[in-house]
Amino acid sequence: MSAAQARHLTTLATGRYGFELQTLMERAGESLAGLAAHLAPDGPVLVVAGRGHNGGVGLAAAHCLARARRAVWVVPTHEAENYSGVPKELLERLAELPNVRLRSSLPKMKFSCALDAAVGMRLEGPPRGRTLDVITVLNNLGCKVLSLDVPTGLAADSGEVPGDVVRASATLALALPKPGTPPGGVVGDLYLASFDLPEALFHDVGLEPFVAPSPWARIV
């Protein structure tokens, strides 16, 4: 599924099919949190979240992990005032949870797992600035890194790497894998979360759905 098809899928889901965007993000976040818990059953988790849909799912995953009594550190990629809509609401709710720490910079400590929800499919040119800093830190944490849809720095459609890129241990694709994310390399192990979208929705975008046998399935 290309980046354009993914955007079209979301537009139809929240329009013609009547899904709330928050519901979609929370479903995807549950899958992301569940896979993170599978890969790293205990210990603190770092969540790096951008201000778009990818970041919103990362923030929803942080909620799920916090409810499961995991210690969660959340580092937004932008200042709080730059977040809007569902991601903003999720960020504000996270600030109220006792086992969640919001940080403006990446903490120097040991994590069992880090969630890369910084950019997703909206990569434009080589990463720079804050995004480049995030990539550098994630690659040097020494823990498992789980990317959402695509590792930050990787072009979802082409698989090109125009600059630095997150070297993920695993990547969770939402709905369908993206063309530039075959298993291995910087993608790591590839998993798919289908989260119960109607088959007709995929057909409307010209795609065949894949229904995972559990909240996620590994693609080999």
Curated annotation (Swiss-Prot):
Catalysed reactions listed for this entry: (6R)-NADHX = (6S)-NADHX; (6R)-NADPHX = (6S)-NADPHX
The keyword Transmembrane helix belongs to this UniProt entry's keyword annotation: no
Pfam families recorded: YjeF_N (PF03853)
Domain YjeF N-terminal, first and last residues per copy: 6-203
Family statement drawn from the similarity comment of this UniProt entry: Belongs to the NnrE/AIBP family.
Protein's job: Catalyzes the epimerization of the S- and R-forms of NAD(P)HX, a damaged form of NAD(P)H that is a result of enzymatic or heat-dependent hydration. This is a prerequisite for the S-specific NAD(P)H-hydrate dehydratase to allow the repair of both epimers of NAD(P)HX.
Name of the protein: NAD(P)H-hydrate epimerase
Protein source organism: Truepera radiovictrix (strain DSM 17093 / CIP 108686 / LMG 22925 / RQ-24)
